[in-house]
UniProtKB/Swiss-Prot annotation:
Pathway: Amino-acid biosynthesis; L-arginine biosynthesis; N(2)-acetyl-L-ornithine from L-glutamate: step 2/4. Its EC number is 2.7.2.8. The lineage of its organism: Bacteria, Bacillati, Actinomycetota, Actinomycetes, Mycobacteriales. GO terms for cellular component: cytoplasm. It is found in: Cytoplasm. This is Acetylglutamate kinase.
Length: 310
C-alpha cells in the first residue's frame, strides 16, 4: 500500500484527501473506539501505521479511544515461562498464575509499546487499564462449550463502565490506550476479552463507531469462499448467526451486536493485516471490512456501502 501511495501524483493525492472530506466532517468531535489486535500488534510496519492512524484521526478532530488485547504476546510469554496456554470457546483459560502474566504483558508491554509509538508523533497517548479510576467492574464469565456452561478461571464479563474516568483524558485532547483487566465486587481480578471490553466501552461512551481489528477481511457466510464476505449486516440478523461462527469470531461479532443495540451508530470488523485499515474503513465509501448496523437502517435503505448486504 505504501508503494501505491508513493506512486500517486500530487493531483491524485489531493483528490484522495478531498474525497475524505464528508467523512472527516461526519466524525469530527465524535468518539471512535478501536480494538487493536491481530497482526497489527506484532508486525512492526503495521504497528507504526496503526499509531499514525490514531494520530491522524486526533489531528483532524476525531476523538479515538484504543482498547488493546495482547494474545500473541501473552502466548509468547507463557511459552517462555513453560506454562501451557489453553483456549475454550474463544476465550483464554486464565488461572491465577496466568492472570499475573496477562496483567504484566497487557499493561507493562503491549500498552506501553503502543503509547510509545503514538507519542513518537507528539504527546497524545495516555496508558490506563480497567483497574484505574474504577473504569471497569466485572464478574466471572462462564463460557458455553458443547452446550454446557464452563468455568475457565479468572475470565470476566464487564458489569459496569465508569465512562467519566476516561472523559477527562479525551476532553484534554489525549488518546486513551486501555488494557482490559478489571476488578470484581468479589475481590477478584478478571481478564476481560478485549473485543468484549471495546464494545462495552463504546456503548458507555456513546461512541459514533466501534472498530475491531482482526486477521481476516471480515465476516464470511460461506468460508473459505471469498465471494461470501459480508459488507453490511443488521445487528439482529447477525445475532441469529452467532452460534454458527468460529469460536474466535464469536466475541468480535457479539461485541459489535451489543454495541449497536446499545446505541453505537455502527460497528466494524476490519482486516488489521492491511496498513491504515482504520482510515480506509472510516474515510472511504467502500471500506475494507464488515459493518454492523441497526436493522432499521437495512430496511429503510439508509445504508450506502458496497453491495453485499445480509
Amino acid at each position: 500500500m505504501t508503494a501505491t501511495i508513493d506512486n500517486l501524483t500530487s493531483r491524485e493525492r489531493a483528490t484522495v484527501l478531498a474525497d475524505a472530506l464528508p467523512w472527516l466532517q461526519r466524525y469530527r468531535d465524535k468518539i471512535v473506539v478501536v480494538k487493536y489486535g491481530g497482526n497489527a500488534m506484532v508486525d512492526e510496519e503495521l504497528k507504526a501505521a496503526f499509531a499514525a492512524d490514531m494520530v491522524f484521526l486526533r489531528t483532524v478532530g476525531v476523538r479515538p479511544v484504543v482498547v488493546h488485547g495482547g494474545g500473541p504476546q501473552i502466548s509468547q510469554m507463557l511459552q517462555r515461562l513453560g506454562i501451557e496456554g489453553e483456549f475454550k470457546g474463544g476465550f483464554r483459560v486464565t488461572s491465577p498464575e496466568v492472570l499475573e502474566i496477562v496483567r504484566m504483558v497487557l499493561f507493562g508491554q503491549v500498552g506501553r509499546d503502543l503509547v510509545g509509538l503514538i507519542n513518537s508523533h507528539g504527546p497524545y497517548a495516555v496508558g490506563t487499564s480497567g483497574e484505574d479510576a474504577g473504569l471497569f467492574r466485572a464478574e466471572k464469565r462462564l463460557v458455553e462449550i458443547d452446550g454446557e456452561l464452563t468455568d475457565i478461571g479468572q475470565v470476566g464479563n464487564i458489569t459496569a463502565v465508569n465512562a467519566s474516568s476516561l472523559m477527562g483524558i479525551i476532553d484534554a485532547g489525549r488518546i486513551p490506550v486501555v488494557s482490559t483487566i478489571a476488578p470484581g465486587d468479589d475481590g477478584s481480578v478478571y481478564n476481560i476479552n478485549a473485543d468484549t471490553a471495546a464494545g462495552a466501552l463504546a456503548a458507555a461512551l456513546s461512541a459514533e463507531r466501534l472498530l475491531i481489528l482482526t486477521n481476516v477481511e471480515g465476516l464470511y457466510t460461506d468460508w473459505p469462499n471469498k465471494d461470501s464476505l459480508v459488507s453490511v449486516i443488521g445487528a439482529e440478523r447477525l445475532r441469529e448467526k452467532l452460534s454458527a461462527l468460529g469460536s474466535g469470531m464469536i466475541p468480535k461479532m457479539e461485541s459489535c451486536v451489543d454495541a449497536v443495540i446499545h446505541g453505537v451508530s455502527a460497528a466494524h470488523v476490519i482486516d488489521g493485516r492491511v496498513a491504515h485499515s482504520v482510515l480506509l474503513e472510516l474515510l472511504t465509501s467502500g471500506g475494507v471490512g464488515t459493518m454492523v448496523v441497526p436493522d432499521t437502517e437495512m430496511t429503510n435503505g439508509t445504508v450506502y456501502r458496497k453491495d453485499n448486504h445480509v
